[in-house]
Amino acid sequence: MRLDKYLKVSRIIKRRTVAKNLLDRGLFLINGKVAKPSSEVEVGDVVELSLGRHKITIKVKELAPYVKKEESINLYVVLSDEIIEVIYDEIS
């Protein structure tokens, strides 16, 4: 399944066009490699998302063309969810 579609179906990203725009900016990795919207995702793949200061790592558990909102959480497992702290140097 295409990554942009998977992100929409799993409701990690609410709209496929938004997923495509983020993927075009190189903010996602599949198994450590930069992903494109058309990159294929398979069960067992590890997907890393960098959204602002938020970094989320998930593992794909299941692929489905459509699932109900309540069942979308079953498509992946969150491996890590962290906020990256930004440290600013003081200007004298």
Please state what every model-predicted region is.
Residues 12-13:
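Loop/turn elements at beta-strand to alpha-helix junctions within RNA-recognition modules
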Residues 2-5, 17-21, 27-92:
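Strongly charged
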